[in-house]
Amino acid sequence: MTEKKNLSCSFCGKNREAVDKLIAGPSVYICNECITLSYNIIVTDKPSKDSDSLSLENLPQPLEIKKFLDEYIVGHENAKELFAVSAYNHYKRIFYPEQDEIELEKSNILLVGPTGTGKTLFAKTLAKKLNVPFAIADATTLTEAGYVGDDVESVIERLLTLADYDIDLAQRGIVYIDEVDKKARRSESNVATRDVSGEGVQQALLRLVEGTIIKVKLGNGKKYSEDFIEFDTSNVLFILGGAFVGVEKTIERRLTKSSTIGFNATVIDADAKNNLLSKLLPEDVIDYGLIPELVGRLPILISLENLTEGQLRQVLSVKNNSVDQVKTLLAIDKIELEFTEKFYSDVAKIAIKQKLGARSVKSIVEYSVMNIMYRAPELQKSGVTRVVFDNYPISLDKVPTLVYSDGNTHTDTEYKIYRGLNEKATLE
């Protein structure tokens, strides 16, 4: 008994009463604390496979990046090319050997476009292609340091966490900050009026975007003994996005500013008005309310137009689309879903009317199958193997058809149309 009481860790010297567990080897003992410390040292020092995977030699070129974006994003051809080149140049800059006479500056990106045009998807898909950590934040939740809410640097904490605290990997990651336009307020007279707290957030963003060293607080599961770690944002690709509602008026005002009354007056036709975002310049964003210093650190300005009805139809065919997702979910219940081209066309028409872009397509599709999903176990037990949607079920005369294992088919008389999205689902 005396011998057991005197047992101690062969590494730190603590006796068994001072630790939670003491593990015995052939001739040595190790406590739980030394095991944890040793594991952290090994994991921290171990080179990350992900951080080694991206280099100048295997960096995807613009054509390859664009092709990958095409798999997930419909339309926006020019925007995808600009985006691909900008991302390629950013990472070339990271891997380019430093030379005294040439300093390559960061090329952060500002995406401007209406809701549902795919701003977030652009950033997320790029990170997927490059296999780098990706953190997203909503600018509306960000506040200046000292105020209630998340400060701007919290997004870097998130990036580091997603990189499993691999500092080198995180410092090559991508940060997307959405709704940055909400930090730039405008008055009813269309004159930009700065929101003091919003401008404070912009100033804090400026510091991160241009590249600085900050101290990041480490959370639970940290690999380092310190509570803080220094993080250099110089090589992080920052992508800021926003709808900038009403910026078209700013563009139109700029385009007509130099016009004169009479025969020489500049007239903007209807087609040009529908494509005003394609003429967006940095000065328009500044006039909207972003501070010039921040806009200057976002040299790549990319505008995204609303998708056409035909393009919204294509959204149902891209990789990981909403149709494939609901089909997979019901396949688990051993029920096959079938949609006709008329159904797809109806979805696109409804999405156009709702004016929420590609984002609404997923909701529209999901609402159509909600009642089938609710009754799936019951339908499967009754012998239903397939459900066919010939139209979008906006009314009870357009409900789906049930196909049974014996080959018989019946109109789904029990189908229920849920209110909500379908209240606006008109095809007239």
Regions found by a protein language model. Give the residues of each.
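AAA+ P-loop NTPase nucleotide-binding core of proteostasis motors
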Residues: 2-24, 29-33, 39-43, 47-135, ...
